[in-house]
């Protein structure tokens, strides 16, 4: 969900979260993120998979978290775990590809397989930081 908040609304998002947390509350933010700094999402992914999404870089989020009064206590970068997850999703998809083709067509199947394989490579080879988990 956080990938659809967008940079323009980060400050509001974190300030609102800070106001809603109990004094001893903990927030866990789970998001796909970038390891190569701020940049727009891939145009193909924007058009075909996640319209309106944005994968943030740490450098974009940390200042907004700090300004909101939240304190970051831990950051986990789980890119290799997510690469494995994507490989498993792709395998499961390929096991049922004929069913998917009957339901959605060959073009969809090729697109989805390409998406899963390219994202797996991106997470495995550090294009994406993937699954940034912030505890605040």
Residue ranges of model-derived segments:
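A short SAM/SAH-binding and catalytic strip from SAM-dependent methyltransferases
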Residues: 1-9
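Structured DNA-binding interfaces in DNA transaction proteins
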Residues: 7, 18, 31
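Serine-hydrolase catalytic core recognition
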Residues: 10-13, 29-31, 37
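A short glycine-rich, Lys/Arg-flanked "PGG" loop and its adjoining helix->strand segment in the class I
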Residues: 11-26
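Substrate-binding/catalytic lobe of Class I Rossmann-like enzymes that use SAM or dcSAM, i.e.
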Residues: 32-136
């Amino acid at each position: 969900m956080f990938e659809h908040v967008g940079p323009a609304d980060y400050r509001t998002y974190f300030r609102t979260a800070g106001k809603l947390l109990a004094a001893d509350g903990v927030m866990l933010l789970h998001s796909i993120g970038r390891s190569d700094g701020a940049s727009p999402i891939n145009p193909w992914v924007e058009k075909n998979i996640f319209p309106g999404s944005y994968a943030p870089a740490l450098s974009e989020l940390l200042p907004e978290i700090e300004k909101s009064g939240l304190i970051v206590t831990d950051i986990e970068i789980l890119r290799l775990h997510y690469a494995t997850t994507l490989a498993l999703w792709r395998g499961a998809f390929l096991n049922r590809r004929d069913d998917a083709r009957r339901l959605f067509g060959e073009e969809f199947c090729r697109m989805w397989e390409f998406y899963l394989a390219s994202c797996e490579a991106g997470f495995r080879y550090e294009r994406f930081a993937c699954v940034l988990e912030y505890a605040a």
